[in-house]
Amino acid sequence: MSRQELRAERRRQAREESAYVAKLKRRGMSRRQIAAEMRHYRSGHRRAIEEARRRAEAARQAAIARQRAIDEGLRNEVQSNIAKDEKTGEDPEVRRAAVDALGTHAGTVVVMDPKTGRVYTVVNQDWGLRRGFKPCSTIKLVTGVAGISEKVIAPVETVSDGGRYRIDLTDALAYSNNTYFQQVSGQVGFDKMMQYAHEMGLGERTGINYPNESSGRIPLFKSGFALNRMGSHGDDFEVTAIQLATLVSAISNGGKLLVPHLPRTVQENSSFKTEVRRKANIESDVWKRMLPGMIGAVNYGSGRK
């Protein structure tokens, strides 16, 4: 039991004891009889509490064991996927660094030049290209762009963080503030949120020269708090790592959605040219306003190691 649960249990026990004593008094029992009865009563309560604690701890340990088994299965899957990656044309030094950075974590790594779309490595290609995942807080990039574009986020406006303080866009991105982006998403609205998600390449293939790329998925409809949460947690989105790489690249390069490409031969390498899928129909100042918060996340915020 947690401390809070234990305090609640003690309060409940005190109420029950008080009611039980009153019941014994109504029976006309003497103080000595009541004291003896209460010792027996409390002994039973202690056994019940210990049993509840034992069961709660057993359930907690079982949950930990299940999660460890899931994590171990995912790590094994990742290592198996990495062994099957197509490495032709990849930069071996970049790949080695990416594999080392991933370590024993269950994940994928995409290394891509945000100005040219040149891909240097994709570690765990099955997850990075062919399997969409809930984007979690990375969806805040879409919410931020939508909020600025729709004038929901003013140039110098701050928003309450749900407590005593107010926070601006830069710190909201840097610290991944859920309350801020939930408010923005709710004010932007579902249709506009989907418009900007499409504009930034979600829900469609990037065109990378690997087979069986996934297009991911975008939500069908959200309203109320579900809409707010979608803009902070990415509920019902499925996004691939390569989609996220092209989205982040578009923010940094001024709105160009590039076609990622890995040159696999000497000829492809020498003739490589940047291919722009499209230019996002978003004002250039919007991208510039996003960058300080993204940099802040790494330098001092939630992305800092």
Language-model region placement:
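Beta-lactam-recognizing serine transpeptidase/beta-lactamase-like catalytic domain environment
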Residues: 85, 106-121, 131, 150-305
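Extended, non-catalytic scaffold segments that flank or surround catalytic motifs
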Residues: 74, 135, 155-157
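Short acidic, glycine/proline-rich loop/turn micro-motifs
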Residues: 81, 123-126
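A short, polar/charged loop-to-alpha-helix boundary motif
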Residues: 129-141
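Short amphipathic alpha-helical face segments that pack within enzyme cores
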Residues: 138-146, 241-246
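Extracytoplasmic/periplasmic proteins that interact with beta-lactams or build/remodel peptidoglycan
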Residues: 1-108, 276-277
